[in-house]
């Protein structure tokens, strides 16, 4: 069973679902035009990931191996429906903004992948922690990409935060610089592709520098034996 430290490291960095596994790219590219949209979808994904991992782990012994995938999809779809109804009730503006990408969480490969590869093979607590940190890793990338695109495209940060957090959150809006016309490349999917590529490249550079700092093991000297 993986330790909590390993789960945190895997979810946030070593096996990040967006930057390493390259899963969930459809919502990542489509919804991350602003920090608010990115954070809203990230929270919804975390809730579904944690819930599906917990339920799959609890019932894994009673699910026949032959039908496990359809059962996992039904569990995930039920949780997504609950999250969709909650968002419709308490964050209606964000619900309209995210649109079809909320129900499309059902088809997100991150969620079904964690249910199949981890939750179905581990106890409830590790499964919940795995879902939490994988979701946090995905949300972190969503928010970073959303911040990059919103700053470059609109010159703002946390625009529309009231859609997620309520009327008080209008004070969170920051205008970094004024733009007469939006930078469309940053706001459209091509800009999202470029942003994801930049984040992946940055992660690879950091990984390489960290690897270079590690002391390298000396190769063992093989001696020929003559008899």
UniProtKB/Swiss-Prot annotation:
The keyword Repeat does not apply. The keyword Protease does not apply. It is found in: Cell inner membrane. Keywords: Cell inner membrane, Cell membrane, Electron transport, Membrane, Translocase, Transmembrane, Transmembrane helix, Transport. It is a multi-pass membrane protein. Part of a membrane-bound complex that couples electron transfer with translocation of ions across the membrane. NCBIfam families: PRK12405.1, rnfE. Belongs to the NqrDE/RnfAE family. This is Ion-translocating oxidoreductase complex subunit E.
């Amino acid at each position: 069973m993986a330790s909590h430290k390993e789960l945190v490291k895997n979810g946030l960095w070593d096996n990040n679902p967006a930057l390493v596994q390259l899963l969930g790219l459809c919502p990542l590219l489509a919804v991350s035009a602003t920090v608010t949209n990115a954070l809203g979808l990230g929270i919804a994904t975390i809730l579904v990931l944690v819930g599906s991992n917990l339920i799959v782990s609890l019932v894994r012994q009673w699910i026949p191996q032959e039908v496990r995938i359809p059962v996992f999809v039904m569990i995930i779809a039920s949780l997504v429906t609950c999250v969709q109804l909650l968002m419709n009730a308490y964050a209606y503006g964000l619900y309209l903004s995210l649109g079809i990408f909320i129900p499309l969480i059902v088809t997100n490969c991150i969620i079904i992948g964690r249910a199949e590869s981890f939750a179905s093979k581990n106890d409830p607590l590790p499964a919940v922690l795995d879902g939490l940190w994988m979701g946090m890793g995905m949300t972190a990338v969503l928010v970073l990409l959303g911040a990059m695109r919103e700053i470059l495209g609109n010159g703002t940060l946390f625009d529309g935060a009231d859609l997620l957090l309520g009327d008080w959150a209008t004070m969170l809006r920051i205008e970094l610089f004024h733009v007469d016309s939006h930078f469309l490349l940053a706001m459209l999917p091509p800009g999202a592709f470029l942003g994801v590529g930049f984040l992946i490249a940055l992660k690879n550079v950091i990984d390489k520098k960290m690897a270079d700092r590690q002391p390298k093991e000396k190769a063992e000297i093989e001696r020929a034996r003559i008899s």
